Amino acid sequence: MKNKYNLLFFLFLLCYGDVALAACTGKLKISPGYSGHTYSFDSSIPNNSNIARYLVEISEKIVCDADQSGWDGKRYAQLHLYSSGALCESVSGDGITFRSNVSGLSWRFPNGIPYHCAAGQINLGGIKYADRNGKVTWNPGELRHEIFLRVDNRFDFSKSRTFSVNTISGRGGLGGDSSVVIPLIGSSFNYSYSNIATCTLTGPSEVNFNTVTTSDVLKGTTHRDLNLRAECRNRGASLGLNFKFEPQYKDVSANKQGVFYAKNTSGSLTYKLTKKADASAIPLNEFVKLIVEDKVNIHTGNTIPLLLTLQKGDGKIATGKIETFLNVTMEHM
């Protein structure tokens, strides 16, 4: 019976390879694909985009005892990467990813690399046969895999900041003897992120006052709706904006009551800008800080209801129209 089990064990080794322990020297490394360890990106980047490129390479010559045997008795080994952090996730049509220490950022291995997600195992190369001494050698420059830092919609785009992303934690090893440790050298990489917003603020191309009469002007009751629509391409939940109203007329002055004057052929006319259903004037000699002063968050696609009121100027009849009345500048707060 004992001989029977010895024979079965011999057949197992013959069929499935020698699983004897193997020793290795050398190191792997993860380094930036371009010079430097600092990168920047902003909120205009599309979802599921690569922020930066990195390389998995051999930093010191790796020499290992061959840990597997083929049907022909030849000894060989395969280099693997074993992740000790989050297990990998398969991304349909786009390889696999390992989550990083920053939510929404992950390390992506592109398609074509054999992997075993349940074991956190990546195959870094094909079979390499041993020399006459039973050793398998990989030299610097012989192995080179591109990986990418990828951003997805889990990333917090609500504010600008700087942060560090750690490399994939783990080690190199062999395909047969999973106990072999080949050091994986890496570090944290610094990123600066700015939440810029690409925005346009649209409104009527003209505000027409052709129907205004002298009595209307004297009463100060004439007004026109001025609905401004914010169309922004930013990745935050909401965007606080500064609005700076700049009439195209050059001879413009403003007072602390939020009234400004624009001269045209009819004389000096007075306009007051207010929030709809609120008689208080918005100061036009400063930025109109909707997010700070009026507690309004502007979301993409929201309409900002404002009124442009024509008031008493120099007593002359106010006719005509104001074309392209507003130039608007915006910035993230």
Curated annotation (Swiss-Prot):
Residues 1-22 form the signal peptide. Its main location: other. Three disulfide bonds are present. One of its GO terms (cellular component) is pilus. InterPro entries: Adhesion_dom_sf. Keywords: Disulfide bond, Fimbrium, Plasmid, Signal. It comes from the Bacteria. It is found in: Fimbrium. Minor component of K99 fimbriae. Is not required for binding of K99 fimbriae to the ganglioside receptor. May play a role in initiation, elongation and flexibility of the fimbriae. Requires the FanE protein for its stability. This is Protein FanF. The gene is fanF.
